[in-house]
Amino acid sequence: MLRGVLIPVITPFEEDGSVDEGTLRQLVDFYLQASVQGLFALGSSGQGPAMSAVERKHAAEIIIDQTASRTPVIVHVGTADTPTTIELAVHAAEKGAVAIGVIPPYYYCDAPDSAIIAHFREVADAVQLPVYIYENPKYCGISISPQLGVRMKEEIPLIRGMKVAYGAGAMQDYVKLFPDDVSVFTGNADIFGLVPFGVAGMINPPTSFVPELCVELWQSLDRGDYGVAADLQRKVNTVTQIVIANIKRHGRGTVAETFRMRGISVKRFPRWDTAPLPPEASAEMHRAFRDAGILE
């Protein structure tokens, strides 16, 4: 079972919108040097839903190849339809992913539970890989409640994990109701009060440019050093607040700027056109990180 910090890898793009292979490989090495416990590819931060199936396969191949089995890779393969999801899942399995992430089939968000379960069952049957439910109702319009999650696990034994992107209040219900062979990860940054009660770790986008800090936090919690963990959690919370505030004000180009601050020249992110972060906003953000002791 996976535990720890699984990084939601961003997919960097060239100016023409194609996948920037060189920078993506650089990002993988950056995360491996930080000793993260795994990579979560092509979810929301990975821009999977904004890419074609061909592009998603290409990005998955790059990530898995560059990782070279040095850390587990979960590839998110979810789409609005079952055949394409299966196509991406089969590809991920063939290339060496250890598991797949699957968001419920979005757009038709009035689908009954039976249709959602059928979708997940068909995907699982096609690949025989561990399946991680991607619970992200903000973007997909469908929520997998703890009760539905348990029913899905009963009918689909290959379900082995879940990323709960926006359900902090229900985290302990997921942990309590799922059997022990299901790892529950939070998409939030505040894990101090969750890991001691069974949450397996974090898959948090805003902090993905400071993986060392996240790994330190996880390790301190895992060994029960709660004094150190409390200090690290405050830093992680500060990072999250600064990044989210800038995303709300200036858009997702903020994310590219955070990586540039770490020496990784992300040319284009997100996939779509977005105004660059104003120089004064970038300087202010960097100053805030420096004042908090997060970056030099």
What do the predicted segments below correspond to?
Residues 1, 174-176, 259:
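Catalytic cores of TIM-barrel enzymes
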Residues 1-7, 11-141, 151, 275, ...:
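Active-site beta->alpha loop and helix N-cap motifs at the rims of alpha/beta catalytic domains
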Residues 6-11, 34-36, 198, 206, ...:
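C-terminal alpha-helical cap/extension of soluble enzyme domains
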Residues 15, 21, 53, 146, ...:
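Alpha-helix N-capping/helix-start residues
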Residues 24, 56, 60, 85, ...:
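A general structural signal for well-ordered alpha-helical segments in protein cores
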Residues 122-126, 137-240, 244-247:
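Catalytic alpha/beta core domains of metabolic enzymes, predominantly
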